[in-house]
Amino acid sequence: MGDDRPFVCNAPGCGQRFTNEDHLAVHKHKHEMTLKFGPARTDSVIIADQTPTPTRFLKNCEEVGLFNELASSFEHEFKKAADEDEKKAAAGPLDMSLPSTPDIKIKEEEPVEVDSSPPDSPASSPCSPPLKEKEVTPKPVLISTPTPTIVRPGSLPLHLGYDPLHPTLPSPTSVITQAPPSNRQMGSPTGSLPLVMHLANGQTMPVLPGPPVQMPSVISLARPVSMVPNIPGIPGPPVNSSGSISPSGHPIPSEAKMRLKATLTHQVSSINGGCGMVVGSASTMVTARPEQSQILIQHPDAPSPAQPQVSPAQPTPSTGGRRRRTVDEDPDERRQRFLERNRAAASRCRQKRKLWVSSLEKKAEELTSQNIQLSNEVTLLRNEVAQLKQLLLAHKDCPVTALQKKTQGYLESPKESSEPTGSPAPVIQHSSATAPSNGLSVRSAAEAVATSVLTQMASQRTELSMPIQSHVIMTPQSQSAGR
């Protein structure tokens, strides 16, 4: 059995044998793949199965082992690039300029330099005059001090007063900030230098120098700032190849994680562009404006290394900073707009309600006046009916039979074609003649006669006004003759 399969797998817990070396190599490769990708597959969030967003990547980078992989993959390339850039820096001064920016005037009273030194050097030191490079005892840098200060990448992360964003510079050189009143400038060499981070356990972790990275926490301006392409009298900064991290108040693993997060975040945000300052990857020189930047505060944990801190009053120019500030201010602005819309809607509703109520009041007044007019007309008509009834009651016993017979023929002749009913005269005669014989009450008969006469008189007014007038005139004459 052992002679047929002489090749044995030396992995712990596996004693399989194979006939040839190729099968053993394939088997060992399976072991390596399992050991390498096993923890990632058992993780709660599987990056391969989901959309690889920056948030998920930054959340799970430590569990996946991203730091070790980056250090082992790019260490040689970054060391080689650092050596080449060191040779270039030693050959001649760097051209601290950006190609696409206009010029502004600057004060040249205190020129500053970019200095990079080994990790045991202090993180911040006052700058010497140009063409002289010497180490000075580190002093705490306060806001009111007029001396410029060199801050190495080791003293990053940046601590904001109110914003927990920690961006980093993707270069081994330093950011020079200065507090006295002067113009602000920023320069960048055309070449880029990588940054290799040496961790405490002996490993090195490179930071990828991607496209120009926006620095919202180090360089912040409230108005547009221009760049100076070439500064006479200031030599290029001598760059040390180590680019290592100087001691700071925070533990080194947290700095490494934070640097990686900030680099990835700025590489994503720099694609969208913005109106912020673009920082080159080799060196950046900044001189502050009097009303806008006092940005160096000594870190409370470390006595000598000074870490830049942005005052809360300065606006952050990059897209990420604006987005974060907008998110912070959004609730108040949304509430303000919501209240304004509510007030406008309430005022419009009140106006509509006032118009509706006023129209209802006008309509009610019109209907009330019309009702009063109609009631007055009804009262007048009732009074007229009462008067006519009294006249009929007064003349109910008049001997008008002969006169009615005479006028009957005259009244019926023009009404034969239009009105077949009889004239009121025979009705009066019939009622007056039949009232005593039937034994009815005189008043009830008079009311019935008056009602019928009024209805017929109303119908005859339009057609036979003259005969009715003669009849009305003749009735009192016959009454007076009878009396």
UniProtKB/Swiss-Prot annotation:
Residues recorded as bearing Phosphoserine in the entry: S413, S423
Annotated ranges, domain bZIP: 332-395
Region Leucine-zipper, annotated ranges: 360-388
Biased composition, class Polar residues, residue ranges: 429-440
List of residues that carry Phosphothreonine: T51, T53, T101
Similarity remark: Belongs to the bZIP family.
Record protein name field: Cyclic AMP-dependent transcription factor ATF-7
Organism for this UniProt entry: Pongo abelii
Gene name of the record: ATF7
